[in-house]
């Protein structure tokens, strides 16, 4: 006797199957679609197919913002061109990963964003669905994040390089990678057998490093390492 196997659909945070041990199969998903469309006590449920991932929620949740796309969807706005899939779910061609925070905001009024999601991505979805209160909330969060980043104190690193007069011009002209010339100090001259005296200098250079709020500053580039190595030989 042949067994019937279900083809599972992937679950999404906040979507169908979340907290139920995995995704729903296509047959079960279609069955829930019929329940969502059946008149009576279950008619308050609405199914959404967002980028291939199914979400189940209530009309009350989707109608939190009367000016939003989702409100118009629930009201069957004739000016809104919306299709349904074979299970009766509304088709929305958007990223399901970023729809989770949007739907949860409509559910409980709080903005919760996982660490692996960017605020800008949530803002894009909030603007698409035209949820004005969420748009303002995400923009405030982005401004707060950027403000903290701009207030990170600067760290100045200084290096002292020793060079001869003939090397001085080339060293200063080729200096890059954020290093700036600060001071030049003459330390006399050196004598090499068979050659003329060479004036020697100490060249002081500096660089500004931003201390990252999430960890140490980035590794110096190759040119910076060369300057550091030359300074360490003093």
From Swiss-Prot:
It is found in: Cytoplasm, Cytosol; Cytoplasm; Nucleus. SMART domains: BTB (SM00225). SUPFAM superfamilies: POZ domain (SSF54695). One of its GO terms (cellular component) is Cul3-RING ubiquitin ligase complex. It comes from the Eukaryota. Its interaction with CUL3 suggests that it may act as a substrate adapter in some E3 ligase complex. Does not affect the function of Kv channel Kv2.1/KCNB1, Kv1.2/KCNA2, Kv4.2/KCND2 and Kv3.4/KCNC4. This is BTB/POZ domain-containing protein KCTD5.
């Amino acid at each position: 006797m042949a067994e019937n196997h279900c083809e599972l659909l992937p679950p999404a945070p906040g979507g169908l199957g979340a907290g139920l041990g995995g995704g729903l199969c296509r047959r079960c998903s279609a069955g829930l679609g019929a329940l969502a469309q059946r008149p009576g006590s279950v008619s308050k449920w609405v199914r959404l197919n967002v980028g291939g991932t199914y979400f189940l929620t209530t009309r009350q949740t989707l109608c939190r913002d009367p000016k939003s796309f989702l409100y118009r969807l629930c009201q069957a706005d004739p000016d809104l061109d919306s299709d349904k899939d074979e299970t009766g779910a509304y088709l929305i061609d958007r990223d399901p990963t970023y729809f989770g925070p949007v739907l949860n905001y409509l559910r409980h009024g709080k903005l919760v964003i996982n660490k692996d999601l960017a605020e800008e991505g949530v803002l894009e979805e909030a603007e698409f669905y035209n949820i004005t209160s969420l748009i303002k909330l995400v923009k405030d969060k982005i401004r707060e994040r950027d403000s903290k980043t701009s207030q990170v104190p600067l760290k100045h690193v200084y290096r002292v390089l020793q060079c001869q007069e003939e090397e001085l011009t080339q060293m200063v002209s080729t200096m890059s990678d954020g290093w700036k010339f600060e001071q030049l100090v003459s330390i006399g001259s050196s004598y090499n057998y068979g050659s003329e005296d060479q004036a020697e200098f100490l060249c002081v250079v500096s660089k500004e490093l931003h201390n990252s709020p999430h960890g140490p500053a980035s590794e110096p580039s190759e040119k910076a390492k060369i300057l550091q190595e030359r300074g360490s030989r003093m």
